[in-house]
């Protein structure tokens, strides 16, 4: 189960990875970092916005509670990113900032711990996967082929965003955290739409939390490709706001998945409305500033 979640998260987040790495290579910090944080916020916007569309089903009331551990890891990584942006530390090892190193370590250790917990709870599932070798091989081949296409398109998206910022005078933070983030997060939104249409709230929440974890890792992976210091040291102060909002929306997601009942339609929709309004507010803030 955990392996599938990771694979799906990586697959849907490949555009963010290629965009941020490409932006790091060409020296555009705000697109590299803004794309990661902007994608996290847009993912929440997609999840809760689509929940409003499917509100009659009240899908969040039927979700499993095993997303809590993933949510805690997301909160911890968010705290690390906020600390990295606030401190602006210049300490690095081979062009890799201390914040990036901590993120990678926490991400890997966190996934190992979550995987071990899920193995204890779902040990019986192993029996169902013994004869699926051929299917897995075909899936991996398709995954690699699609990955190549995404790698090329993601790089083109980053270069286009950088050129747009230079030619129009628009803020690179706006382009990276809003425009590029929206474009690179389309696979996540489509995955959530499909899951909610099938009434599979667990897949939808798992996809978003898994993708958001990977989006934070994406920033850390992009760090060594930037050669003029560390991404965390050079990032725009506006990105701190995005990091804080992402932290708060993660808390809302964790609280919502714990609910079993809602008093009425409005109380059910209230968290989703809060997230949607918060995202719109962030967009307006970045545009005006």
Q: What does each of the following model-derived ranges do?
A:
Residues 1-289:
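Hydrophobic alpha-helical segments, chiefly the membrane-spanning helices
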């Amino acid at each position: 189960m955990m392996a599938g979640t990771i694979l799906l998260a990586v697959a849907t987040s490949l555009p963010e990875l290629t965009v941020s790495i490409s932006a790091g290579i060409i020296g555009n910090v705000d697109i590299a970092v803004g794309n990661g944080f902007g994608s996290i916020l847009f993912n929440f916007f997609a999840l809760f916005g689509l929940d409003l569309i499917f509100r009659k089903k009240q899908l969040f009331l039927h979700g499993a509670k095993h997303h809590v551990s993933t949510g805690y890891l997301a909160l911890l990584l968010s705290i690390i990113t906020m600390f990295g942006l606030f401190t602006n530390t210049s300490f690095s090892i081979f062009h890799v900032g201390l914040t990036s190193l901590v993120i990678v370590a926490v991400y890997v250790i966190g996934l190992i711990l979550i995987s071990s917990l899920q193995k204890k709870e779902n040990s019986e599932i192993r029996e169902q996967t013994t004869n699926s070798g051929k299917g897995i091989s075909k899936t991996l081949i398709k995954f690699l082929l699609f990955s190549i296409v995404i790698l090329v398109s993601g790089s083109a998206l980053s270069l286009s965003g950088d050129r747009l910022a230079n030619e129009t005078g628009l803020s690179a933070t706006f382009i990276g955290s809003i425009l590029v983030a929206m474009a690179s997060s389309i696979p996540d939104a489509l995955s959530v739409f499909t899951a909610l249409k099938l009434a599979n709230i667990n897949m939808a929440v798992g996809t978003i939390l898994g993708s958001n974890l990977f989006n934070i890792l994406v920033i850390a992976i992009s760090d060594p490709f930037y050669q003029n210091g560390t991404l965390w040291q050079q990032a725009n102060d506006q990105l701190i706001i995005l990091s804080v909002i992402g932290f708060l929306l993660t808390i809302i997601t964790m609280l919502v998945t714990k609910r079993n009942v809602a008093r009425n339609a409005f109380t059910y929709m209230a968290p989703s409305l809060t997230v949607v309004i918060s995202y719109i507010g962030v967009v307006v803030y970045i545009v005006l500033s």
